[in-house]
Amino acid sequence: MKVTVLSVGRLRPPWTDDVAHYEKLLGRHCRLEIVELRDGARLGARIPERAFVSVLDEGGTAYDSVGFSRFIEQRRMSGIDLCFVVGGAYGGVEVEADHRLSLGPMTLPHQLARVVLLEQLYRAHSILAGEPYHHG
């Protein structure tokens, strides 16, 4: 399964180390591509063809970690790649989406949202693989 994370804005320290950490861990479970774009105007053009598109949105569907792992497993079983879209500092992502994902009711800085998304992707894959990372 290929997972693409499209993000508006450039990642800056200290978040770069965290993203690199989860990028390395996720490499054992999926093919991960992280794409940073200067502005949201180009997002639509960078979405992979036939990918299931999930936009981060505070009004989207919220999952617990096990529920999110089930969401990932359903996508994996369908044979369709996943594309997550993370807006910039001012949000406002305007792309056609199959799904809207909430990381919780609080507003997060876009750089932190990217780290949280990658951590939850790793946690979901660890749950599916039966690895001891998740203690829930």
Model features per residue range: what roles?
Residues 6, 35, 54, 99-101:
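Hydrophobic/aromatic beta-strand patches that form the interior of the parallel beta-sheet core
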Residues 11, 58-61, 88-91:
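Short glycine-rich anion-binding loops that position phosphate/pyrophosphate groups of nucleotides
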Residues 5, 54, 87, 117:
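Conserved RecA-like P-loop NTPase ATPase core
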Residues 22, 70-73, 99-100:
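Glycine-rich, phosphate-binding/catalytic loops in enzymes
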Residues 90, 94-135:
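Structured adenosyl-cofactor binding patch, chiefly the S-adenosyl-L-methionine
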Residues 1-26:
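N-terminal beta1-alpha1 ligand-phosphate binding loop
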